[in-house]
Amino acid sequence: MYEKLIGAHVSASGGVELAPVRAHEIGANAFALFTKNQRQWAAKPLEASSIRAFKANCKKWGFGSEAILPHDSYLINLGAPEPEKLDKSRAAFVDEMLRCDQLGLTLLNFHPGSHLQQVSEEACLATIAESINLAHRQVPNVIAVIENTAGQGSNLGWRFEHLAAIIDQVEDKERVGVCLDTCHTFAAGYDLRTKAACDETFAEFERVVGMHYLRAMHINDSKGKLASRVDRHHSLGMGEIGWECFEYIAQDARFNGIPLILETIDPDIWATEIATLRKFSTQKEN
């Protein structure tokens, strides 16, 4: 059993049951997926045969629920200022949680939301937290995993304080967590280029949010520079962050047992990137 759960966001095209197969093919022991089309509001319910096959394939290839990170639709805005869009987003988010529960999955990764220049940051963060509370009341078992953002436009979640404010207002603290995306973190202004910078950034996360809330990570290099507030992923070692950060994460025991998911731009080298991270992880533990 590897201590590091390393994988990529694989396609579920042709059925969710194919995602674990694709993850296994690239040497992953973790993976992310969309359980429905991420660019559409409506989705037909999961078929019983797909659910059975998904669970069987996960069992066959050794993927436990702690290693699988479903991502919700990009259309959902849990902080939407317009009541109609908010209601639609909340209903869609509950549906995403239900799909996770049907598949036996316990994590749901999502982007927190945007104020669209219509309400204050504080009001939007409170709305996001209430959206999570409403979903928790309707769906058991599934943990809402808030992804930090790069800070583009009016998107919230780029400052660690935003994440802390949401968590503070979520009633069931056992069912809320954070997914830190390295590209987003760097683009938001938190340096990761050296081990010293990583020490400082994760110490700040511990101070503001708490490492015990870290449920997953997206492992991406960045095309944009530090504090660019631009969400543009790059292959590992080819962007502005560089390999030192990814070696740091692979070798630090604080990141054991959570999905470390590539969303890098060239799927053809995912297997190589996973193998490199795995090699780093076996060299030493900090």
UniProtKB/Swiss-Prot annotation:
InterPro entries in the cross-refs: AP_endonuc_2, AP_endonuc_F2_Zn_BS, Xyl_isomerase-like_sf, Xyl_isomerase-like_TIM-brl
Residues binding Zn(2+) 1: 71, 111, 147
Cofactor(s) the protein needs: Zn(2+)
Positions bound to Zn(2+) 2: 147, 181, 218, 263
GO MF term list: deoxyribonuclease IV (phage-T4-induced) activity; DNA binding; DNA-(apurinic or apyrimidinic site) endonuclease activity; phosphoric diester hydrolase activity; zinc ion binding
SMART domains: AP2Ec
Family to which this protein belongs: Belongs to the AP endonuclease 2 family.
Name of the molecule in the record: Probable endonuclease 4
Record organism: Vibrio cholerae serotype O1 (strain ATCC 39315 / El Tor Inaba N16961)
Gene name of the record: nfo
